[in-house]
Amino acid sequence: MEHNDVKVGLSVSMSGKYRLQGQQALNGVSLWQSHTTTQGGIPVGSVTRPVRLVWYDDASRSGRARENVRRLLQEDRVDILLGPYSSNLTLAAAEIAEEQKKLLWNYGGTSDEIFSRGWKCVVGISTPASDYFRDLPGWLARQNPELRRICVLYSGKGTFGGQVSRGIIESAQEASYSVHSVPLNDPSSNPDLVLSTLRELNPEVLVLAGNFQDELAILQTRSRWPNTVRIIAAVSGGMAAFGSQLGQASEDVIGASQWEPGLSVSPTVGPSSEWFVDAFQKEFGPTPGYVSAGAYASVLIAAECVRHMGSTDNDALRSAASQLNCNTFYGRFQIDRPTGKQLGHRVCLVRWRDSAKTVLAA
């Protein structure tokens, strides 16, 4: 490859527990690459430079993600570094990015912990974890005001589940709900613990905040839950694979989604949602989910900052990102300047019925 290529690099989970989301992310970035290539590349100053994509499988492991990021920065010398999927892997990648003073464009790690360490290298694209279900108590108050008891089962591993739990606890307590938060580890290997917890608390609203596999394992025991449970919400309910993998057990489950094809957004940067969905389906087949959309949006935003500054210099791109306030098909982009935490983007609540997701009114 010629030295003037703009190299885009990422550590991505093509194996291990995040392989589904990793493939979705890679599809999103690959679509951006192919579309940008048809346009001749990225404008950098007075020259339009071709793009090159470099990625390595991290096998859903933090240690491998660190190795991959170090390789991307020291050997491949990428110009744009994208983060992996999952908060744990993003924390690992960000450690190396901060050490190497390289900006990390983060679509897939949403734990608030990522933005609380004083790092200057992370630019968040997606809504932070603590806001995933922050609007759920308000929705419940309008739709089911008689329900007052909420139980949050969250993953005790890592920081993501605890941050989701914190957000809903704060908003539920403000609305005078009774709320219990219970950490769980490996529920698939101990389903009786989940059942005993539910039978002890008898919640009316159950919220799950874990990884995809753990939430599926819990929901597969749904027929044995106490009949007090009237409303179910799960972080993974925002993913397209949720319904196909759970079948009837997904019925009426509420999810949190970073993006849905039907959302009305007028982009000021990049293509429309309609274009993205159509192009993605032509390239890969299925309708894209929010992981693919977020990955595409992250490199779209990075490229916009390159175009605006006429440079791939790290400090210049951080300055551009701090000043940028725009809409892409993925939603609004505006970060907190000191931390890089995303402020403008919003999640939406969705509900599964008849194997399909619908967006709930805000």
Predicted regions and their residues:
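Periplasmic-binding protein-like
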Residues: 72-85, 105-107, 149-154, 201-212, ...
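Beta-alpha junction/loop-to-helix N-cap segments that form part of ligand/metal-binding clefts
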Residues: 21-25, 42-116, 186-191, 216
